[in-house]
Each structure stands twice: as C-alpha cells, then as structure tokens.
Amino acid sequence: MDDFERRRELRRQKREEMRLEAERLSYQRNDDDEEEAARERRRRARQERLRQKEEGDVSGEVTEKSEVNAQNSVAEEETKRSTDDEAALLERLARREERRQKRLQEALERQKEFDPTITDGSLSVPSRREVNNVEENEITGKEEKVETRQGRCEIEETETVTKSYQRNNWRQDGEEEGKKEEKDSEEEKPKEVPTEENQVDVAVEKSTDKEEVVETKTLAVNAENDTNAMLEGEQSITDAADKEKEEAEKEREKLEAEEKERLKAEEEKKAAEEKQKAEEEKKAAEERERAKAEEEKRAAEERERAKAEEERKAAEERERAKAEEERKAAEERAKAEEERKAAEERAKAEEERKAAEERAKAEKERKAAEERERAKAEEEKRAAEEKARLEAEKLKEKKKMEEKKAQEEKAQANLLRKQEEDKEAKVEAKKESLPEKLQPTSKKDQVKDNKDKEKAPKEEMKSVWDRKRGVPEQKAQNGERELTTPKLKSTENAFGRSNLKGAANAEAGSEKLKEKQQEAAVELDELKKRREERRKILEEEEQKKKQEEAERKIREEEEKKRMKEEIERRRAEAAEKRQKVPEDGVSEEKKPFKCFSPKGSSLKIEERAEFLNKSAQKSGMKPAHTTAVVSKIDSRLEQYTSAVVGNKAAKPAKPAASDLPVPAEGVRNIKSMWEKGNVFSSPGGTGTPNKETAGLKVGVSSRINEWLTKTPEGNKSPAPKPSDLRPGDVSGKRNLWEKQSVEKPAASSSKVTATGKKSETNGLRQFEKEP
C-alpha cells in the first residue's frame, strides 16, 4: 500500500511540475501584459489624485499610501530583472520625465474643464471617492498578492497567471494610453537594478506625489474661497508646476550624478578586482610554468641518467651474451655430434628391427607352410577315414536290406500259409462231398492221407524258397498223390502275384534313388566349381599381398633415404648457425631461452638453461618430423596397418590344444565367409544336415558310396588334390580349426559321439551316423 501511495504521489508531482512549467512559459509570454497593467494602475492613481483635490488630507494620505504600495510592488518586481547599460538608463529617465510633464498638463486642462460645473463635481465627489476607494482596494489587494506570490513556492504561481489575465482586461480598457507608455514599461523594468536605485526612485516619486497633494489642496482652498480667484489659482498652479519641475529636474540631475558616481565606483571596483584577478592568474601561470620547467628538467636529467644506465647495462649484456653464445656454440656442436650418433643408432636399430621383422615374417611363413602341410596330411587321413566309414556304412546298409527282405519274405510266407489253410479247408469239404467210394477204406489209408496233407504245405514252402534261391524243383516222391499238384499250382499263382507287386515297388524305389543320385552329383559339381573359384580368389589375394609387400619395402627405403637427407640438411643448417655468431644483442632476443642470473647461483641456473635449451630444440625438431610423416599418412595407412598385423603375428603362438592359430588377413576373411555360409548354396551350419540329404538318409549315402567306389576318375579330375592346396587355402585352415576344436575336451561331447562324427573332404555337409 505504501508503494502504491508513493507512486501516486510521484505521478501527482510530475503532473504538477508539467503544469507549472507550462504556466511559467505563459508567464514569460505575459510579462509585457503585467507591465502594461502596472502602468495603467499608476496612471489611474495619478488621475484619482488630481480628481480628489477637493477632498481632505485623509483622502490624500490614502492615495499616497496606495501609490507608495504600488511603487514598492513595482520596485520589488523590477529588482528581479536585469538592467541595460548606463546610456539606455539615462535615456529612459529622460523620456519618463517628459511623459510626466505631459500628463500634468493634461490634468490641468481637465481641471479647467471641470471648473464651470464645480457644483456637479462636488456632488459627484462622494460617488467618485467610493469608486476610487474600491479600485484602490482592488489594486492594493492585487499588488499584495503579487508580493506574496514572489515569496511563495512555484506551485502558487497559478495565482499570478489568473491576475495577469485580469490585468489584460484592464489593459483593454486603457488601450490607447497603454500604447503611449510601452516604452515607459521598458524603462521601468531595468534588469538587475540594485535596491538602492529602486529606493531612490521611490523617494523621488513620493516627493512629487506630496507636491501634487499640496497643489491639489491649495487649489481646493482657492476654489472654496472664491470662484473669481480661478485665474490666480491657475497662475499659482502653473507657478507651482514650474517650481516643481525645476525641483524635479534638480533632483533628477542629482540622482543621475549619484548614479553615475556609483556606477563609476562599481566599474572601478570591478576593474580593480579584474586586475587583481588577472595578476593572480598571471602569478599562478608563472608558477605553473616554473614548476613545469623544473619538472621537465628533472625528467630530462632522469632520462639521461636512465639512458646512461641502460647503455652500461647493454654493454654488460652484450659481453655476457657473447660469452653465452660461445658457450652455446660449443654445446651446440656437442649436441649435433650427439644427435648424429643418436641418428645413426636409431637407423641401426631401425635396420635391426626391420631385419627382426623379416626374420619373424619368414618364421611365420615357415610355420604357415608347416601348418598347411600338416593340414594336408590331416586332410588325406580324413579322406581315408571317410572312405572306410562309407564302406562300413555300405555294408551295414546292405545287411539292413537283407534283413528287410527276410522280414518281407516271412510275412509273405505267413500269408501263403494262411491262404493254403483256407484252401485245404475247402478241399476237405469237397472230399467229404465225394462219394464214399473215393474215400479210403482202411484206417491205414486215412492216416497216410493225413500225413500227406501235413507234408504238402511244407514241401510247397520249400519249393517257394528254392525257386527264390534258384534251386531247381525236385520230382515228386513215390507214394505222393496227384491231389497235391493243383494245390501247388494255386499257391504258385498267389505267390507270383505278390512277387510282381514287390518288383514294382523295388523299381519305383530305384528310380527315386537315381533321381536323388543325380541331384547329389549336381550339388557336388557346384561345390567343385565354388572350390575352384575360392582357389582363384586366394591366388589373387596372395599376389596382391606380395605386391603390397614389395610396395611397402620400396616406400620404407624411400622413407629411410628421406630421413637421412633430412638429418644431413639439419646438420648443415646447425653448422651454418654456429658459424653466424650475432654481433649485437638484438638477435639474442630471438633465442629460445636466456638466463641472466646473479653471480652466486649462476652455475645451477646455467645448467638449467642448457637443459631447457636442449628440450626446446628437441621439441622443435619433433613436430617437423611428425608433420612430415603425417603429411603422407594417407598414402602410408595400409603400410602401417600391415606392419601392426605383422608385429602381432610375429609373436610365437603357444601350440596349446585350446588356442586357435592366428590366420592371415585374407584367410580370416575367407574363414568368415565359411562361417557365415556364403560359400555354400545353403546357409546351414555344419552340424545341421540339408533338407534333401535328410530326406535321402540311407539311399543317398549308398549312392554316394557307389559313386566313390565305381567312378574314382570322376572324383579326381574336378576335385583338387591335397597337393593342390595353396599356402592360404581356406579348406586346410578350416579343417585344421575343426580338428583342434574336436580335440578340445569341452567340445568333444557335442561333436564326437560313441560311433563318431566326421566331415567329408569335398566340402559336403556332415552326415550323422545312425546309432
């Protein structure tokens, strides 16, 4: 709330200031109106004094007081304004006196006009007195307000504006006389008039007013005593006016003389003050000049002394710098010698390192060749094992087929036995229906018939097995009846139909096996083609590696040569710098480090300076070499990469069973291709068989075994021999990796079972052996 009140008060003050500023501007514009109103008031007051000549001393005193108040108020207003020069003041005084004389004459003429009607004038005196009293009261009240306004704050200046508007109305009433007294307003408004001058003007006006009052009194007495004495009164008035004029002239001259003397005294005083001030300023300037000259003299002496000191120090500095330069030259020579030796040692170490790298590389290649030979032997061994496994599988498959055929024959025999029993039952029924004459008469014959019936199925089964095995049929034994022949014929017909069905099924299975064999042959051809493509890719990579190695050696030779040239050039530059010893201390500022120390600790600081110089120069040489190497980093990126790979490969790998050999970069890429399955037609893993091979199972394996055993020349021509394997052949690496992974105890449980799991030599997928 207090903040709100404070802001509101500030806004109110700003509005008030703006309003007062506007009123001040209007007041300045209305100064002329105020001056005209003051002149109008004085003119009316003088007229009223002339009109009140018939009144008593009371009215005279009232007019005197009002005039004095008016003059005092005007004087107070005039004290706030500035005056012109002395000549303008005198001219204004002269013009004012002339106008006063004219106004007196006009008053006398108006008095003469009032004389014939003196009674009317006496009757109207009270009324005019009341009007004059009202006007005088208003004028005095206004003048008092003007006086109080000058003592108040700026907020109360609004009253002055309103009164100025009222005075403008009064000016319109007496516009004609206001025009006459425009110049008088300028005279009565002197700028910066002192209070003494205002008091003198007031005293003069008071004296003239008193004389006018006396004059009016005498005129009133003469008029009352006798109207016939008008001429004498007029004469006395004119005499009194002349006398007053002379006295006023004397008083004016006296005042002018006093004013001139006062102004002259003030001018002399001002001139003396100015002169004294000028003398003081002159003395101060001289003092400043003297102090400045002394300061300059001291500064010049100081500069001379400092210059001499600097020259002495510079000479000492040059001597010390010369000694330091000689010492540094000796150090530089020793340092150059050390650098030369260090460069030679570095070159020697570099050559030894390169030789070691070459040896390591040769050792690596030898080991790689041994690995390839071992992989080749392992491949041959695996091929032999695979062949033996295929033979064993073939025998096992043949045995299974025989068992299956035996089971089928047994089932067919059971079926035939059942059919034979049915037929025997039918034959028994027919026999019973035959006439009794055909039946055997004796029990001996019946027993014989029963035995024959029991033997007949056995002989039929025997004949069937003999026919299947290729044994010729034997003739019927003696004592066998002819009834067995139709039974055998019927059984032969039934068994022949079943054999035809089995033969048709066997032919359909053989056709399927042929189709699957053809598909397997096509897949083998594709695998051979892919293997040939891989071999070509490996050959190209090997050639590319050899070419890159040759280029790398050439670049290394060029780099060695360039480094030697750079070392020789720097040595020559260092020798030239040592020969050019600077004669002055200017070039010493360009040195990397200088140490000027006190004599006590000079030895330690010089040693420290030498160390810093050496380190600075070494740091200055290293960036140059680094920039030279970095400038060719794009062209040498492959060289650095191959060198890093060679360094890593140069480390001898421990032949542990759990560690894998570190292959070359090309072999690693091909190995990743093998692992991703991009080489094969299908991306299946080594452990998961193909869908087609999974469907083949026994038949495909038997056909593959037949293909391996019957057509060995077809296998030799497209498939590369173990001797055809190149140093970076991927198959050898892959088989070696598989061998080592098989040897691991952790992987043995998953890859090697009780019967064993092995991969084929031609890149075929693994076929698990049936348990």
UniProtKB/Swiss-Prot annotation:
Residues 23-91, 104-599, 676-771 are annotated as: Disordered. It is found in: Cytoplasm, Cytoskeleton; Cytoplasm, Myofibril; Cytoplasm, Cytoskeleton, Stress fiber. Phosphorylated in non-muscle cells. Phosphorylation by CDK1 during mitosis causes caldesmon to dissociate from microfilaments. Phosphorylation reduces caldesmon binding to actin, myosin, and calmodulin as well as its inhibition of actomyosin ATPase activity. Phosphorylation also occurs in both quiescent and dividing smooth muscle cells with similar effects on the interaction with actin and calmodulin and on microfilaments reorganization. Disulfide bonds: none annotated. The N-terminal part seems to be a myosin/calmodulin-binding domain, and the C-terminal a tropomyosin/actin/calmodulin-binding domain. These two domains are separated by a central helical region in the muscle forms. The modification Phosphoserine is found at S597, S682, S717. Residues 674-680 are annotated as: Calmodulin-binding. This is Caldesmon. It comes from Gallus gallus (Chicken). Residues 251-390 are annotated as: 10 X 13 AA approximate tandem repeats.
